[in-house]
Structures are given as C-alpha cells and as structure tokens.
C-alpha cells in the first residue's frame, strides 16, 4: 500500500499528475491519448526552446540560458529538473545530456522549425528581434573553413540599438567565441547593419549581397573575408524551408446574425 510520501513522489515524477497539480502552469489534458500525454511534457512553456538548444549541442546551464535569454534562471532550473524527471535528460558533472527519449524528439523539434519557417508570416517573425539569440545562433553555425587559417575577429555593430550594440566573433583554430565586450584583438572585418537586416540574412529571407545593394549593410576590412561572407556566415538550419508558392489566405469569418422570430 502506498504511503502519502510514496504517492507524492509518484505524482512529482508523473507528467500527467504534475500537470494537474494546482501550482502548475498547466492543468493537464486528462486524456489517455499519446498525443495528449506527450503534449503535457513537450508543450510546457519554454520546453521546446530548451530542447532545441540541447539538440543543437548546448550542454551547460549558462549556454542554455544564452540560447533562451528571456527565461529566468529559476524557471530554467525548474524546466531542466522536469525534463530529468520525465526521462528526457540526465545531469552529470555539470553537463546536461539528452537521453535516447530526448534525442528521439529531434525530428519533432526540427519539423516544428521547418513548419514555422514555411507557414508563419516572416514579417511577424522579424518583429521578435533579439541580438543575443541572433549572435549566439551565428556563433554556433559559423563555418570556419572559408576563413583564413589564423585568428579572425569580426565585429558586428547594430547602430539603432541603445545597448548591446556591438558584438565580436573570434574564430581561432576552428573554434568560435562570442564576445559582448571588446576582446582586445585587431578587428579583421567590421560589419554595420540594422539588426533586422542581419536577422533576415540569418533566416534566409535575404542575402548579404541584397542587403549591400539596398544600402543596409556596410562591411569593411579584409576583402577576402568580405567577399566570402555569405559562405562562412552560415544560415539558420530552417532557412532551406520553402514558402508556399502562393500565401494561403485565411477564410474570412462570417458575422453571426440573429434573426428575429415572428
């Protein structure tokens, strides 16, 4: 016979029970359907983004926080504990690693990203600009191969921002570091562009050449690095998703008319 403590422990480890607790942010679906049960784990606020970061290779708490900058440290800790309780994640020696169950969500997370790129209005996406997330993603996907075989320092300046205006990417021996303060190295390439333009390039909506032609992208410094920028810059893994040929127009709602009786 289960004691109250046993019951409490089981409830804390069961996603359906946890979702139904009064202090939870969700109430649970109360269905045996596998879609409902999986959604109680996957669809908790911030969880898909945390899983995205883990699937992209982030292993440490601070790296996860940089990839999801708007989540509080307290809530991130809670979500990581929940993922461990649900069997998707293990923590060992200060590192977080996905279990086979967590890795099995890769196709789902990537599919969600491709769906968003294909069907969500690009203009809506470009309203959610975040220099921290953009530069962190660029650091993660930059390809050092086209760059000169030496330390290369690239400075990005987003002139319209009041703070977090300047960022540096330092590429050395295949490693890429992101700095928010001047690393003290000579800058090989200097880029000045609005954050929206840089985000558009990263998302595959625009290109370096198109933004230069439009007068929204200034680059100076090493000419070879500038010439091959589109090659080493990398793109969002979702950039290759193609938009539908013709935008799907939503069906207009017909106003409800109450007909008088008589």
Enumerate the predicted regions with their spans.
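Basic amphipathic alpha-helical segments that dock to polyanions
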Residues: 76-84
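N-terminal helix-turn-helix DNA-binding core of bacterial DNA-binding proteins
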Residues: 33-71, 86
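Amphipathic alpha-helical dimerization/coiled-coil segments
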Residues: 110-157, 164, 223
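Basic, amphipathic "hinge/linker" alpha-helix immediately C-terminal to the N-terminal HTH DNA-binding motif
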Residues: 43, 92-112
């Amino acid at each position: 016979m289960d004691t109250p403590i046993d019951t409490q422990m089981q409830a804390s480890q069961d996603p359906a029970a946890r979702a139904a607790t009064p202090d939870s942010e969700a109430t649970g679906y109360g269905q045996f359907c596998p879609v409902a049960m999986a959604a109680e784990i996957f669809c908790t606020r911030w969880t898909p983004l945390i899983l995205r970061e883990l699937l992209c290779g982030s292993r440490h708490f601070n790296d996860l926080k940089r990839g999801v900058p708007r989540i509080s440290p307290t809530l991130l800790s809670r979500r990581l504990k929940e993922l461990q309780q649900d069997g998707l994640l293990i923590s060992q020696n200060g590192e977080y690693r996905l279990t086979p169950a967590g890795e099995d969500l890769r196709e789902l997370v990537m599919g969600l990203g491709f769906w968003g790129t294909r069907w969500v209005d690009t203009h809506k996406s470009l309203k959610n600009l975040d220099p921290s997330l953009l530069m962190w993603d660029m650091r993660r996907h930059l390809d050092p191969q086209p760059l000169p075989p030496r330390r290369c320092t690239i400075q990005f300046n987003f002139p319209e921002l009041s703070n977090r205006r300047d960022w540096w990417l330092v590429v050395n021996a295949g490693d890429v570091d992101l700095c928010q303060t001047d690393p003290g190295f000579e800058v090989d390439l200097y880029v000045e562009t609005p954050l929206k333009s840089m985000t558009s390039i990263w998302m595959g909506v625009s290109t370096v050449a198109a933004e230069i032609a439009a007068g929204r992208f200034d680059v100076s410094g090493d000419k070879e690095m500038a010439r091959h920028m589109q090659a080493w810059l990398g793109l969002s893994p979702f950039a290759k998703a193609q938009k539908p040929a013709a935008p799907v127009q939503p069906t207009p709602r017909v106003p409800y008319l109450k007909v008088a009786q008589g």
